[in-house]
Swiss-Prot record:
Signal peptide (UniProt feature, chain positions): 1-29
Assigned keywords, A-Z: Glycoprotein, Repeat, Signal
Quaternary assembly: Associates with GP2 and GP3.
Lineage: Eukaryota, Viridiplantae, Chlorophyta, core chlorophytes, Chlorophyceae
Annotated protein name in UniProt: Vegetative cell wall protein gp1
Regions of compositional bias (Pro residues) in chain numbering: 41-380
Originating species: Chlamydomonas reinhardtii (Chlamydomonas smithii)
Region (Disordered): 41-382, 397-439
PTM remark: N-glycosylated and O-glycosylated.
49 X 5 AA approximate repeats of P-P-S-P-X: annotated segments: 40-339
Top-level taxon of origin: Eukaryota
Length: 555
């Protein structure tokens, strides 16, 4: 008998221990990771859950461990000791929150039976439940959440505190830890309560209400023991005020400086007037100069825009909605951007055109000798000088770019004839093949008097072997003041055999039958050679030859 009496308490303790283990096992079974209810780590439940109030369904699971607390979010953290045994609380709240409260209702009953048994043996355990003992406080704590819905009280019933008593013995040490997480949780709900636009926070409470209906009966058995923790949440609530992000608007204040766009200063710089178009001298080609200005403006524009761009980054920092108004202020900054373009025509472009003219002068030197030799011929009639044309006008098609007669282009010459034999071709021009008769004409920028011209040198770029007949005739274009232009042939039926390789062909001023005899000062006084005309032979279906340069040999 004595043994039995001594064994009785031991057996009772063993039974209690078995019940607790069974309950824990069941909780673990429900809380298997990847199962219906996941066991969040102790730190995870408080902080992550509140931040994601938007999805109501996820929110309830996180509070599930804290569900022992009456306020759906706040008290939960105190019970977070449950992490070891959060399973019991989690089943009730989560299940009702997502799909249907009905399944959870059966779940609470199952924990209920164990709860009565544990209370009697773990009389020592009550110390942990003792804090929850004051049920009355629990209603007050729900009071703040009341605006969301009376649901908070209902969570208190589901508070399977009955399971919690057994849990406290083992996780008693953790219990202190939960309080620390709890403060974070309340802050999140707290901002909602004060802030009118806290619709998100109400959303989580709304899921909570479903829980109360089913577990309403269980609520009486457990007199809202977790209420004591609830008072703790109120204390954290003060920290909540700091949570309001209004301080973030401070960044916007810097944003106003961004509107300061000093872009207006750029506009003052008046766009420099475009450089006066130089007169069209015989030796200076106009086309090159105009193209140069456009490229120069492009570079200036990129540097200026970067300055306005920095302000735009500032608005991004004030991600909060309040700053959004600030961005409009930066928007005005774009108007200044047009101002930068104005500087673009700054003097910088003007220099750019200057280089383009510089090349033109370089060729001019070649013509410059022209005037000097012209006076010399009289004293030394034997001397022969080669004069190259600076500009050429093709009345048909020049370099394949002309659409109608009269187009102008620069004609390039070489000072040394010997060095050009059978070596690369110069940029030349050729008549359109569709012309009938097909012809091309090069006109010198300045005419030479007939008396000073010994012969004509033409550089031909030979591009095809057939047909044998390349040029039907080569003519000098001669004009006299007050008279119409006339053409005097100086060669006829020029064939490939005469050209040999692309090079220079020189023709004298010997007259041809049917034309004026002799082109000289005695025959045609005051007449000048204006240019050279080449007529393509009738047998050339697709002429591929071109005149690269034409020059006059002075006497």
């Amino acid at each position: 008998m004595m043994r039995r009496q001594h064994a009785a308490p031991l057996v009772g303790a063993v039974n209690v221990l078995m019940v607790v283990l069974a309950f824990v096992a069941s909780a673990n079974a429900q809380c298997v990771p990847g199962g219906i209810f996941n066991c969040p780590p102790s730190p995870a439940p408080p902080s992550p859950a509140p931040p994601s109030p938007a999805p109501p369904s996820p929110a309830p699971p996180s509070p599930a461990p804290p569900s022992p607390g009456p306020p759906s979010p706040a008290p939960p953290s105190p019970p977070s000791p449950a992490p070891p045994s959060p399973a019991p609380p989690s089943p009730a709240p989560p299940s009702p929150a997502p799909p249907s409260p009905a399944p959870p209702s059966p779940a609470p009953p199952s924990p209920a039976p164990p709860s009565p048994a544990p209370p009697s043996p773990p009389s020592p355990a009550p110390p942990s439940p003792s804090p929850p003992a004051p049920p009355s406080p629990s209603p007050p704590s729900p009071a703040p959440p009341l605006p969301p819905s009376p649901a908070p009280p209902s969570p208190s019933p589901p508070v399977p505190p009955s399971p919690s008593p057994p849990v406290p013995p083992s996780p008693a040490p953790p219990s202190p830890t939960p309080p620390s997480p709890s403060p974070p949780v309340p802050p999140s709900p707290a901002p909602p309560s004060p802030a009118p636009p806290v619709p998100p926070s109400p959303a989580p409470p709304s899921p909570a209400p479903p829980v109360p209906p089913s577990p309403a009966p269980p609520s009486p058995p457990s007199p809202a023991p977790p209420s004591p923790p609830s008072p703790a949440p109120p204390s954290p609530s003060p920290p909540a005020p700091p949570s309001p992000v209004p301080p973030s608007p401070a960044p916007p204040s810097p944003a106003p400086p961004s509107p300061k766009p000093p872009a207006p200063p750029p506009p003052p710089s008046p766009p420099p007037p475009p450089p006066p178009r130089p007169p069209f001298p015989a030796n200076t080609p106009m086309p090159p100069s105009p193209p140069s200005p456009p490229p120069s403006p492009a570079p200036p524009t990129p540097p200026t825009p970067p300055s306005p761009s920095p302000p735009s980054p500032v608005p991004p920092s004030p991600a909060p909605v309040p700053p959004s108004p600030a961005p409009p202020s930066p928007a005005p900054s774009p108007p200044p951007s047009p101002a930068p373009p104005t500087p673009s025509p700054s003097p910088s472009p003007s220099p750019s055109p200057s280089p383009s003219p510089s090349p033109s002068p370089s060729p001019s030197p070649s013509p410059s000798p022209i005037p000097s030799p012209s006076p010399k011929p009289s004293p030394s009639p034997v001397a022969v000088k080669l004069v190259w044309a600076d500009d050429a006008i093709a009345f048909d098609d020049l370099n394949g770019t002309s659409t109608r007669p009269g187009s102008a282009s620069r004609m390039v010459g070489e000072p040394d004839i010997a060095g050009t034999k059978c070596k690369g071709n110069l940029k030349g021009w050729m008549p359109k093949p569709s012309r009938n008769p097909r012809w091309g004409q090069a006109v010198f920028s300045g005419g030479r008097t007939v008396g000073s011209v010994a012969n004509v040198t033409i550089r031909v770029a030979f591009a095809t072997e057939k047909p044998a007949l390349i040029y039907s005739s080569i003519e000098l274009v001669v004009y006299n003041t007050g008279a119409t232009l006339i053409r005097v042939p100086i060669a006829a039926n020029v064939t490939r055999s005469q050209i040999r390789c692309p090079g220079f062909l020189t023709y004298g001023t010997t007259p041809i039958a049917g034309y004026p005899t002799g082109i000289d000062a005695t025959t045609w006084p005051n007449w000048k050679i204006a240019g050279v005309r080449i007529n393509m032979g009738a047998g050339n279906k697709k002429p591929k030859t071109s005149i690269d340069a034409v020059g006059l040999n002075l006497k």
